[in-house]
């Protein structure tokens, strides 16, 4: 056995199983695809579940991978010991109803012990098998030749893989004996002991049964193989090191942490914890961001935020009082890019996301820590040990302290937190937000109004027709259900109509509802909005313009064709926009929200910086190019697995059924979508981005117009330009830039002239300023309050005072313009020699009027808040100067 780097070990493993007929697959994303049971991929087998369950056909019966994984179940222990980490890589070889124990056991032994591969001494390896698995035991002892004293039979708890119902089976684990120095010293120490001597490096799982979850097992006709070997653990063996933080690729990151902090690893237990936390967490964060995860307060985004902020806090504990994590990203990339080239492809984006998140936290961490420490001090003085849920909530809401971070910091001081109280406050916040959303809802009715309706769900016909005959199954005036509603003498608003069939699209998926009319023999209604209830009823919010409408009436529902078309233009354009953004900005762009009505579309997407004007121009050009190419837009319903194979983009977090609706634009854009669309991109007419902005951390928004709205907007802008041209007395729009430059030049000249006049006025004021000056300790003191005087003018006056004064002097001047009050203090050189400094004076004097400021020994400024205390502050100047003279 000789030293081997982690990257070399990974490649050797994959090469070995390729030589055994396996297809090498790249690591899957850390984001589970179609598996709601997982937040993050945490094993080599996890992304391959569909192949094991038969939901999908594997690309080959034999597959090998090195899968990046993250586990955060024991995050609070990461750093405290060298055994725990959140990021790891899992080597694996898999058989989908192909080979079984007879092949996989000898292969595992060959890879570990052959001189061509790992060359681990055979006497260092021990094997465990399930106590009833004689087949595996015999293969190990008879075919491979393992001595019985290196074999151990263990029970179901240790050597049987089972997770509820479904495929399961016994497993066989391979252990490496690290030597007695790692052991517990007990006579009973052996494989299965809790000490560190026997380290499990490879688990071979034999899926040969189908469990019903009730203790019954049926043998599978065609069993599977699933193996997993921790790459970092094997690297510990091959490099002869004690733990994962000493493995070469991890060490490179750890050494960088040492360099940034000026601390040395293994010299102080407390320091070591922080170094390990940062080393581990930055590796996880780098890979998570590379796979498109962004910091947030929910789900995997919360995990990322928690890791980043925990690492940032430990940086503070090492004395790194600035954002620094982004500097470690490059080291992580360099150590792993040979196996994960996407890290290098996304390096700028990864650094931007991590840098921005850390900078955001840096702005609040110190204030938050001070508040938390004060809370803990207060508890200790009161001999209490429970931090209130409301206080924990405030730390989260105001300073961005995740619950777990507060919990960890408090635990270090022996303080517990009221988690139930915290969650109660979070629930209240969500309820407040929900109430606000309900206030903004244009319809005042509650979904509960139709909750007891005993009728079939409304049939939506609007994909194929804009006109449908329907029967009224329910009516309401937004307060109660009723059998009939009439207009009396005037139109009646807030009439809610439920039909058995409707062509009206209800507001959902970010698309606004259709408008139109519902008419019958005795009534005419104008439809303003449509909502779909959880039970599937389409509720039309209408104005009853004439007549009477009754339950049971047969009516004609007709959608406004042009209004529907305007929405369709915007919706299809949004699909083109997302594809264009991914092409220009990168594959990390994902939809985070959208809204389309007849006048505008806005699209929210994941991106961590403002989109540059150049990038926006490229995006806009791409969308318009696709419009002018007259691409066909096709809509199909298909099984969800078929849609995924086509590469259809789904909205993250959205729940889909077995059959989905897919909107495809000639393969250039393919998305799951239930909305209405044009049939050809040429019908969009044109696309114009009107704004780009931030709506949340890591979320940008683009607003755009299409079709006739583009022309309307252009006409409005042209009219505005004509108005500006007339105001500036330009001959026409084309000469507007020249005229604007001329006006700016005139304005600049007048501003210069005004400043010269102000300077002369200031000079005249300065000349008389010391006429009635007081004197303290040989220093002349002048103070004055000027209205209509800017800070720049005060600065000029102070410069003039210092230039002209021949004796020690101090001047304290206050100026006010609009609502801004400024104080300026100057101390000439002769007064400085007596120990006076402008910066010290301005701090003490301005504080009287609620001000704050500072500066240099000769000049300082402050902003004042309390105008009523200006006279008091100026009256105190003499005493403060006298005090500071000593």
Identify the residue ranges that each predicted region occupies.
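A glycine- and charged-residue-rich anion-binding loop/surface
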Residues: 1-886
């Amino acid at each position: 056995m000789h030293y081997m780097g982690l990257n070399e070990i990974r490649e050797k493993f994959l090469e070995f199983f390729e030589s055994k007929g396996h297809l090498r697959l790249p690591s899957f994303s850390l984001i589970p695809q179609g598996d709601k049971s997982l937040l993050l991929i945490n094993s080599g087998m996890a992304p391959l579940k569909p192949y094991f369950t038969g939901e999908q056909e594997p690309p080959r019966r034999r597959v090998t991978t090195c899968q990046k994984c993250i586990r955060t179940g024991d995050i609070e222990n990461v750093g405290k010991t060298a055994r725990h980490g959140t990021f790891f890589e899992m080597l694996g070889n898999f058989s989908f109803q192909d080979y079984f124990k007879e092949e996989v056991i000898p292969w595992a032994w060959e890879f570990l012990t052959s001189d061509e591969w790992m060359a681990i001494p055979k006497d260092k390896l021990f094997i465990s098998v399930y106590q009833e698995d004689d087949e595996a035991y015999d293969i190990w002892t008879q075919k491979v030749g393992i001595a019985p004293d290196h074999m151990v039979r263990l029970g179901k708890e240790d050597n049987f893989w089972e997770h509820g119902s479904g495929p399961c089976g016994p497993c066989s684990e391979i252990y490496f004996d690290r030597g007695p120095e790692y052991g517990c010293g007990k006579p009973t120490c052996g494989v299965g002991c809790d000490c560190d001597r026997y380290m499990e490096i490879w688990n071979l799982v034999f899926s040969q049964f189908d469990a019903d979850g009730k203790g019954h097992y049926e043998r599978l006709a065609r069993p599977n193989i699933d193996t997993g070997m921790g790459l970092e653990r094997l690297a510990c063996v091959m490099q002869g090191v004690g733990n994962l933080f000493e493995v070469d690729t991890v060490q490179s990151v750890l050494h960088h942490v040492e360099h940034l902090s000026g601390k040395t690893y293994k010299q102080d237990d407390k320091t070591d914890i922080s170094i390990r936390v940062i080393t581990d967490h930055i590796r996880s964060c780098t890979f998570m961001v590379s796979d498109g995860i962004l910091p947030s307060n929910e789900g995997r985004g919360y995990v990322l935020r928690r890791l980043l902020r925990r690492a940032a806090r430990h940086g503070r504990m090492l004395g790194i009082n600035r954002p620094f994590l982004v500097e470690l990203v490059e080291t992580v990339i360099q150590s792993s890019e040979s196996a994960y080239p996407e890290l290098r492809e996304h390096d700028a984006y990864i650094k931007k996301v991590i840098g921005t998140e850390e900078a955001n936290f840096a702005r609040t961490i110190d204030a938050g820590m001070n508040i938390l420490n004060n809370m803990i001090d207060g508890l200790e003085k009161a001999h209490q040990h429970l931090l209130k849920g409301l206080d924990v909530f405030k730390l989260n809401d105001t300073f961005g302290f995740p619950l777990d971070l507060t919990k960890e910091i408090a635990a270090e001081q022996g303080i517990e937190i009221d988690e139930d109280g915290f969650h109660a406050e979070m629930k209240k916040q969500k309820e407040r937000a929900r109430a606000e959303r309900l206030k903004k809802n244009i319809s005042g009715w509650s979904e509960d109004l139709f909750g007891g309706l005993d009728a079939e769900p409304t049939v939506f016909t609007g994909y194929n027709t804009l006109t449908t005959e329907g029967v009224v199954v329910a009516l309401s005036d937004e307060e109660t259900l009723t059998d009939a509603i009439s207009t009396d003498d005037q139109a009646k608003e807030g009439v809610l109509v439920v039909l058995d069939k409707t062509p009206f699209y209800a507001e959902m998926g970010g698309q606004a509802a259709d408008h139109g009319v519902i008419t019958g023999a005795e009534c005419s209604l104008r439809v303003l909005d449509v909502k779909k209830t959880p039970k599937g009823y389409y509720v039309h919010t209408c104005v009853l313009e004439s007549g009477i409408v009754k339950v049971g009436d047969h009516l004609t529902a007709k959608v406004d064709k042009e209004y529907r078309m305007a929405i369709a233009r915007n919706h299809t354009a949004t699909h083109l926009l997302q594809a264009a953004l991914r092409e220009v900005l990168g594959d990390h762009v994902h939809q985070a929200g959208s809204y389309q009505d007849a006048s505008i579309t806005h699209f929210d997407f994941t991106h961590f910086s403002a989109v540059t004007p150049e990038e926006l121009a490229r995006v806009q050009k791409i969308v318009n190019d696709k419009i002018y190419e007259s691409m066909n837009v096709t809509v199909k319903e298909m099984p969800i697995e078929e849609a995924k194979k086509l590469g259809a983009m789904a909205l993250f977090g959205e729940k889909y059924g077995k059959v989905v609706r897919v909107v495809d634009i000639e393969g250039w854009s393919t998305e799951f979508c239930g909305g209405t669309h044009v049939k050809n991109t040429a019908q969009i007419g044109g696309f114009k981005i009107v704004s780009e902005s931030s709506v949340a951390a890591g979320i940008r928004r683009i607003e755009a117009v299409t079709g006739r709205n583009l022309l309307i907007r252009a006409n409005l802008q042209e009219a505005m330009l004509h108005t500006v041209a007339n105001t500036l007395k330009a001959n026409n729009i084309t000469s507007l830039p020249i005229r604007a430059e001329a006006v700016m030049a005139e304005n600049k000249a007048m501003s210069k002239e005004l400043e010269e006049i102000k300077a002369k006025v200031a000079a005249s004021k300065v000349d008389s300023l010391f006429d009635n000056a007081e004197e303290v300790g040989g220093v002349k003191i002048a103070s004055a309050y000027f209205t209509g005087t800017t800070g720049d003018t005060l600065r000029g006056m102070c410069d003039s005072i210092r230039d002209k004064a021949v004796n020690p002097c101090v001047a304290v001047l206050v100026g006010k313009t609009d609502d801004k009050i400024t104080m300026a203090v100057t101390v000439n050189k002769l007064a400085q020699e007596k120990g006076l400094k402008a910066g010290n004076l301005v701090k003490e004097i301005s504080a009287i009027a609620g001000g704050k400021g500072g500066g240099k020994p000769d000049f300082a400024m402050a902003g004042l808040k309390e105008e009523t205390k200006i006279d008091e502050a100026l009256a105190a100047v003499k005493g403060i100067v006298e005090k500071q003279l000593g």
